[in-house]
Structures are given as C-alpha cells and as structure tokens.
Amino acid sequence: MERVYTTPLLDKLGIRPGMRVALIDIDDPEIRRLIAERTTDLTEGEPKPETDVVLFGAEAPADLEPLPMLAPRIRPNGAIWVVSRKGKSATLRYEEILDVAKAAGLIDNKVAAFSATHTAVRFVIPVALRPKSPAPGRRR
C-alpha cells in the first residue's frame, strides 16, 4: 500500500512560528515565502546568534566548508539541515556530509524529503554536550 504524505515541509523541518531561521545557499523562492509566512526572523547568509533552524544548501564536498562555523550560531536545541540533491542526480554523498558534521561536533538525527529533487539531513548538538539548564522553579 502506498502511503500518502501530507505533512507540510515546514512542519517536517520543525520550523514553528516566531523561530529564528537562516537560509544559506538555498535558492528557492517558495521556501522563502513559506518561512516568511511563519516567522519574521529570517536571514539569508550568516545566521544570527541563537538561530533555531539553519537550512544549508550543499551540492559538492567543498560546499560543506562553512558547516563547522554554523554550529556555534545555533541554539543548544537548534538544528542545521543540510539540503542536497538526492537519487541518481546526487553530487554529494551522505557519508561526506556526515564526516564534516561529526568533525564539527554534530550528530544526525533525521532525514526529510525537501523536494522532489532534494533531501535534507538534520544535524544537532548532542544532548550530552548542550549547556545544562537549571531545574524548573530554580534560579542560578
């Protein structure tokens, strides 16, 4: 039985109203429009500090060079989605993306279809490496 996927793209990517989002090398007017409908905190290029979600387009191994510099720009519970071609037209292997992300201290924890031609892999800071927050009701 074929499953019908109806989850909107921004929901798959975890982009909620009011989030700080950055687009890097994503040339897609439709995704810009969808994000702008959901949040006003959208930048293109270098992410602002404490960014919630970065969408980072990469087509070749050399395109991954900025990835280690993005990790410090996201919130501790934020995410960097690496968007690349999928299938036979892929010009970047999953292992190549994973190697660069791991060297930057990130782990992968989700893959999503970004479009008919592109896939997205989510990278996050491991929970064990995130700053500890005070227990609810307690102040530091």
Predicted feature locations:
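Glycine-rich, highly charged phosphate/nucleotide-binding loops
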Residues: 37-43, 58-69
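Conserved beta-strand segments of the P-loop GTPase G domain that flank and frequently precede/overlap
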Residues: 24-25, 54-59, 82-85
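Short acidic low-complexity segments
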Residues: 41-51
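Mid-chain, well-packed structural core segment of small domains
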Residues: 64-96
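Long, charge-dense
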Residues: 87-90, 95-100, 104-128
